[in-house]
Amino acid sequence: MILKSISYHNFRNFIDEKFQIHPQLTAILGDNARGKTNLLEGIYFILRGEGFRESREEQLIKFTEKNSYVDAKLQERKTKDVSNLRIDLTLNDFGISKTYFLEKTKKGRHSYLKNLIPVVLFSPEQIEIIDRTMSIRREYFDKFLSSIDPEYKKKLTNYNQAFRRRNKILEIGFESENLDAQLDYWNKLLIDNGTYLIIKRRKYINYLNSNKTIDSKEFSIEYIENKISRERFSEILKKELLVKRTLIGPHRDEYNIFMIEKKIQKKDIHLYGSRSEQRLGLFWLKINELKYLEEYYRKKPILLLDDIFSELDHKNQKLIFNLIGNYQTVVTSTEKELTKLINLTNDSSYDTINL
């Protein structure tokens, strides 16, 4: 299945626009602030039901407008059958609402998303997964696992709600009525939901560690579970009452990413990796994300590349170029970068969108 076309109404800076997407490679060209990343984000949005930037969802709607939509056509490669999909955005006094449609029939989010093409994004900002804090890595894995497993998303939401409520009780401390009973209730919720999260995280990390190699280099992830149990809650309660927050559980899990040198030595690339090694580690994560999604859904994902070529050295550029022949790809680029891309991939099968 491929993305055939996409249309925007009052989405970001687009008023009414429609774009055809090439089955192999589409390059979005244009000066800064012309909307290259907005176009890319719209593709991500129609296939994932959310944008990929940190801004609030209300900002997906064009400034001063109250309603927006993105619609698209997907096509089966073999049968040429076409599917129509659309997401409406509406801004009201209570915030923003999203309505999902397949073939003009209203759907729930999960029902809408489950049969679409998976999508993977590369962008320069994602290097923060490697070079910033542990919470960024936890957020990355949680977001990925939530995107493929509705139960994971539900359990994560339940866990975070229970975590916040338990912290409120710890803030009140001994002044709270029925302290032990209240803590027992929230402890059980944290254990039940947290155990599911840990199992699913461990399963995906095992997958990554079974696919270690990229460009003759090997990487691995050390997943350190912050175990959660009634016994541990009992042992640490006095300290938690002192600091007034929950100190154990998967919200404190750690992911350490290593490059393996000479088959023996492991280098923590967050702490000791060069910029090039950190980028290679990021590519290792994202390439495995592509492969995992392809195996999981039995469909080839769409690859979105946002302004990455100026950030990469020649060696890492070639790694990305090698991917492009295997997946439908949409890339934001400049004329100069596009020329280099076409020369390196030896592929004349592409189209451009000029903004």
List the predicted regions and their residue ranges:
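Conserved NTPase motor "head" modules and their coupling/switch loops across ABC/AAA+ ATPases, GTPases
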Residues: 1-31, 45, 177-302, 311, ...
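Conserved lysine of the Walker
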Residues: 36
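Nucleotide-state sensing region of NTPase/ATPase domains
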Residues: 48-130, 134-136, 145-148, 152, ...
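Structural recognition of the conserved hydrophobic beta-strand(s) that form the central parallel beta-sheet
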Residues: 72, 328-335
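An accessory alpha-helical subdomain
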Residues: 122-215, 224-227
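Walker B catalytic acidic pair
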Residues: 306-308
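A short helix-turn-beta junction within AAA+ P-loop NTPase domains corresponding to the substrate/partner-engaging
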Residues: 343-355
